[in-house]
Amino acid sequence: MASAINLTGLSTYVDQRTDELLTKAVMGAKTLDVIDVMLDVKYKAPLNYLDTTVVFADASTCGWDASGADVFTQRMIEVSPVKVNKEWCARDMRKYWMNYQLLIDANRETLPFEEKIVDENLKAINKKLETAIWQESTLFTGLLGVIAADASAGIKTYDASAGVDYDEVIDKAYSEITDDMYARGEVTMFVSPTVYRGYIASVNAVCCANREVIDAASDFITYPGDSRVTIRPTEGLAGAEISSKDVYAVVTWAKNLVFGTDVEGSENDFKVWYDDKDEMTRFKVLFNAGTQIKFPNEVITIKEA
């Protein structure tokens, strides 16, 4: 009886927190902590930008001499519906819950059963979405796809035929940062966890006595000698490729990258329910997702030669 009550509790737990859980599912990817997020995108939405220049002129005489320019540009962000469908056999679920309840009784687990299931699935969705934001090419176009398709995006190569020197990769990425990128504010180097750990290990290996050792567990570090440049690891670049060549770093001002979604629309959902006919507990998440880059010419990508 207790297990049956708990299965009902799973649906109740989700029903009471649908909006909160959907937001956590969609917004939990770490890249979204720093890039621009555009909400309420149903299908397509324009990204409108104005680039203005003014000219100072001699005002010692009368007259009108119009000068300067206002350049309007527009890029479209397009989102696609993404779904997660899962199901669990009610009998198997009850067996698992009984074992899990023993762990709770022994103080080896603290979360209620229904919260544990939802929490683990949220983590899995967040991890999958983190990769999709950068690498997706089927359901929607990830950021690397946008970069590869735009001729104005700067794709630079690094010769890894003799192996990857992470110091060289980061230094090359740093050397490619333009004045326009600096003018936007803080510049971010997005790198894979492998590049991040490799670079920190390399820096720590030559660490002098008066410099603190860098903790590889840090969410980000700054480039030595330039606090304007942040180096940030992302699982989204793990195993990433452009044209079958490894991607080592993507450099830009973080808000130049855009993720579009819609977590409040009626077509989006986060739901768990029990199907008595099939004796299955079903799990559904539905949301929109898509990416775009405001100014591709202000993105530098370092990839394998």
Task: Please report, for each region that a protein language model flagged, where it lies by residue.
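Non-transmembrane, amphipathic alpha-helical segments
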Residues: 76-78, 113, 281
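Acidic/polar, low-complexity extended loops/arms that serve as protein-protein interfaces
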Residues: 23-98, 127
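Short coil/turn segments at secondary-structure boundaries
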Residues: 133-138, 185-192, 212
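Ordered core of a single globular domain
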Residues: 168-206
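Sequence/fold signature of self-assembling virion shell proteins
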Residues: 2-55, 60, 149-161, 165, ...
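Short loop/turn segments at secondary-structure transitions that flank enzyme active sites
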Residues: 92, 127, 195-197, 289-291
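Helix N-cap / beta->alpha transition motif
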Residues: 89-100, 190-195, 234, 251-254, ...
